[in-house]
Amino acid sequence: SGEEIELSSSNYVIFQKLKEYSNFRSEKSKSKLPEIIKNIALIYQAGKVRLGFLIMACTLAGIAVSPSSPLSAMEIFALAVYVLVASSTSGAFNQWYERDIDAVMDRTKDRPFVTKELEPTNTWNLWLVIISALALYATYQVSNLEATLYLFAGIFTYGIVYTVWLKRWTWMNIVIGGLAGSFAVLVGSAATGNTFAPAPLILSVVLFLWTPPHFW
């Protein structure tokens, strides 16, 4: 009947509109994907995540050389992630703070805060403080206060002592800054309750002594 034809025609129109909307959403999502990937890559670069993985490895080494560990595999994995995140926040602050001197060096002139692919606003510092605080709290939840304090010491050493207080003023900046890696080892040993065991202490000292000649 005419009514059925009209209803069928109406359904067809609705179907076509829904299809067009679905295609529009799909194309819009596709167009945003490269931008999302680019932003992730920029944040990865700004946070010095590769260095963060080395710091994380130091924590795992601290756990490995400790005489015993009450931590489960999941707790070790979680602690490693929290150390990586905390290290990356101090790395990002380092690049934000040094963007003026980074701009005049060939090796660093393409960093995201220099090129302003990431706008160097103070909002970044707020987020970095929040993320650092969350990483510290999470570390406390999965381990103990001592490990958390060592992690804070590492963040503070690299982010403030090395970046703000020393780097522009003395050649000793690398020497003192090397403590950040040593603290990472102690995070691992403290999490197992073996901070003052000989092996992790020796490893932290060796790492401290290795850092200056490695960078020089």
Which role fits each region the language model picked out?
Residues 39-51, 113-121, 161-180:
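Interhelical loop and helix-boundary elements at the membrane-water interface
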Residues 140-145, 164-172, 189-195:
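Membrane-interface helix caps and helix-loop-helix hairpins in membrane proteins
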Residues 57-99, 149-160, 200-210:
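Membrane-embedded alpha-helical segments that form the functional core of polytopic membrane enzymes
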Residues 57-60, 111-112, 175-192:
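Small-residue-rich segments of transmembrane alpha-helices in multi-pass membrane proteins
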Residues 60-64, 132-137, 159-164, 185-190:
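Alpha-helical transmembrane segments of multipass membrane proteins
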Residues 107-149:
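Multi-pass membrane catalytic core of lipid/isoprenoid biosynthesis enzymes
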Residues 87-114, 212-216:
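Acidic (Asp/Glu-rich) catalytic motifs at the cytosolic membrane interface
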Residues 1-42:
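Transit-peptide-like, low-complexity N-terminal presequences
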